[in-house]
Structures are given as structure tokens and as C-alpha cells.
């Protein structure tokens, strides 16, 4: 059953009419609360503790019911610090799950897990709210057509295309361009698809969240002059927050995205950075609730928790949520239960390479390591599939020949291999692209390249029609016509120098 957004106030607005309990026990972020007989709150209900601590400071802590213990007690997990709470303090049952603001009012703003703005830009319109716990769309509501989500980024669209309503894993270390790629995707979905984006910062560094916000303002993704014209809503639950907040912040972001899909009927991009921290927070909460740990100390409900989040990310007949999830792999062990459970849900992987970033090729997407279940002839068509396979074969052959080139030099290769290397180097450079959001740093205007143009460009390189052009003509251009124009400019400049 789908729960439709309400148009009343937030879930904690009718506190006066709710039943009251008292804190019986506090263990870190976990509270045991006693209620009168017959007035037990439901699982996932929001509880609010209000009062003053020993030094007179105001306390306002929201918790979520996780277990019914018997003896009229429930166990709840706090969404903020429990400092100053004491046994015997009054607890109010709101009678509903956590509800957060949704709709256009969220764009350009930063929220915490409770849907409260934390950017000092004043209150948010909370007339339309939605509960964070909802069931996934029913089968009959799903859109089962397999269609590609065009991003306008050549390397992604050609070699590891995204599925509309799919889930993509983004792998990459620090400083290889994850943030810039994320911002370009946010920019392109707004311009090409009329869509919006929601960014969920789950358990990552506060500094990174702040840097992302500043860069979004600088690049125009967040419009400071007219905040309603912004293209993204931000929801942060960072590393310093209690595990309850980190476990639920992904659901808060997803709830905002669902409104844009179901009510506004838009295509939505949902970014989750980092999906591993969602699992990690669930593991902490599971231990605090006294559950028996499973493999490698993870929660026994790992697959269920991951599934309940991921199954809500999908295409319906109204719109789509396409999710891009940064995946941290602990100790680079892909068999660890957290990344292994995540992989089961992914439709595509985009792997960023430090080697390509060091060469100055941006976006630094590895053409050989990045994969997609969409790259099949029956989905993308024979022409696209054949072109992508030939690009990969040429790149793979170049990779195999690099050791020989390093030892013996290019002249020792056969004529055929020299030709392969020349074309592979052109392909490598043509996979780079100027980004709209990087204009302020690079000075070169951004380019959106349609899929048909991308395929045509790579076909011309592979066919040998452009063998006479210098490889630097292919670097940081949009479509292939720009590369040929750039080559002609080089020719004119060299003649003038002579």
C-alpha cells in the first residue's frame, strides 16, 4: 500500500493529543520507554522527549521505536545526541512515523534526518510532508520498459549506460573527480530531462558536505539569488551524528525524491554518499538493540534493510528515480557482506581511475572496469553495442601493449599494433569532455553530447577516417565535429608560425 503525502503539518505537530510515557533506561543512543497499559506506540513511531537538563538547557530529542519489549516498554533509537536525558523524563508518542517536508520548497536547502533545515536560511514550508517509512511501489505501478537514461557524458552513455530508474555504483578514491561528476549529472538532468536531484550525505565527513554545498553554489546548481530555481535538495547525516540519524538519513532523502517522482511526475536523480555508511549505522543500531551479529559482525537483517531501501528506488508509470550510490569497499575486499549485498542491487558500475585523472583525462571513468547490464544489443541496439565493444577491444589491446612500448618503444610494434595504439590514444582523449560545472575553473564551455553523436564520433575514429588528425585535437571536446575543427585550427596555427 502506498502512503500518500499529507498536507497537514509535520508528524510532531499534534503532540498535545498523544499518549505519554516515561524514560525507564538510557544506554547511549538507545532509550527504553514505559507507557501506560494498552497505549503502546507502533514500531517506527516517532517519540519526542522535551524538557530541561540539570543546567536548565532546553532538550528536544526525537527517537524512533524499534522494539516492543513487553511489560509495557518499548526500545527506541535517538536521532540526535542523548546528552542531558534522565530516567523519568516525559516522552510523547506522536502516533506516526517521522515525517519530512517534500516538494519544491526543499530545493536549494540542506536538511537533517528530521527534515529540519540546517543552512540558516530560515524555515521551510512544511504544509506538505511525507512519512519516511513507505512500502515499495506495487508491481502494477512499475514501469518495466528497459530504457537508457541519457546523461550527455560520452564515456558513460557509450560504455556503461545508466538505466532509467536503475541503480548505479560509483567507485573511486579521493581526488579523482567523484564530486564534479555528481554535479555534472545534477546539472544535465535538470537541463535535458527537466528533472531534479536529491543528495543524501550518509555518514560521510562534514567537511566534504560543506565543500559540496559551496561548489554547488559556485557552479550554479544551487541558485543563491533565487533559491527556488535550484536543481537539488540536500539531506545530511554526517559522521558525527548518532547511528540512528545515519541509518535513517537515506530514507529521508529517498522520501523527498519519491514526492518528485509520484506527485510532480519528474525524473529524479538520487545520490547516496555513502551506501556503506548506511549499512554501518544499521550494524551499530543492531548491536545496541541486542541482536545477535551475523557474518563479520554485521546485522542479521542486512539484506532486508538494504532491500527495503533499494526496492523503493525504481521507475513507475509517473516518473523515475535513478540512483547513483558511492560505494566504499572496506579494505578493498569486494566479498565483504556490505559491498557484496549492494552489488546485488546495482544495474551499472562507474569506476573512476586515478591513472586517468593523473593524465588529466576528465571525467576519469575507466572504460574497461566500468560495466552496465544495459549494454546488450536487444536494449541499446546493434550499432551502439558493436561500437562500444570495439572501443573496449581497442582500449584493452593498447593496455596490453603498454609494457612492450615502455621497454622497446613504439617503433618495435607491428604496423597493425601501431595503428591500434594511435586510435586507442585518440579514443582515450575523445572520452574526455568539458563539463558545465567546471567552466568556472577551466574557462572552456561545457558540452552535452547526445548518444547518437557519441556513437558517430567513435565510429569515425575506429573506421580510420580520422587517422590523419593529431591526437590532441580529440582532448576535451564535445562531438567529433569539434575535434576536426580543432585539428584544422592547429593546422592553421602551425602554418602561421612558419
Swiss-Prot record:
Entry GO terms, CC: chloroplast thylakoid membrane; mitochondrion; proton-transporting ATP synthase complex
A GO molecular function held by the record: proton-transporting ATP synthase activity, rotational mechanism
**Catalyses which reaction(s):** ATP + H2O + 4 H(+)(in) = ADP + phosphate + 5 H(+)(out)
Which compartments does it reside in?
Plastid, Chloroplast thylakoid membrane
Q: Which Enzyme Commission number(s) are listed?
A: 7.1.2.2
According to the UniProt entry, the coiled-coil residues are none
Q: Which family does it belong to?
A: Belongs to the ATPase alpha/beta chains family.
The role this protein plays is:
Produces ATP from ADP in the presence of a proton gradient across the membrane. The catalytic sites are hosted primarily by the beta subunits.
The protein's name: ATP synthase subunit beta, chloroplastic
Q: Which organism is it from?
A: Galbulimima belgraveana
What's the encoding gene here?
Answer: atpB
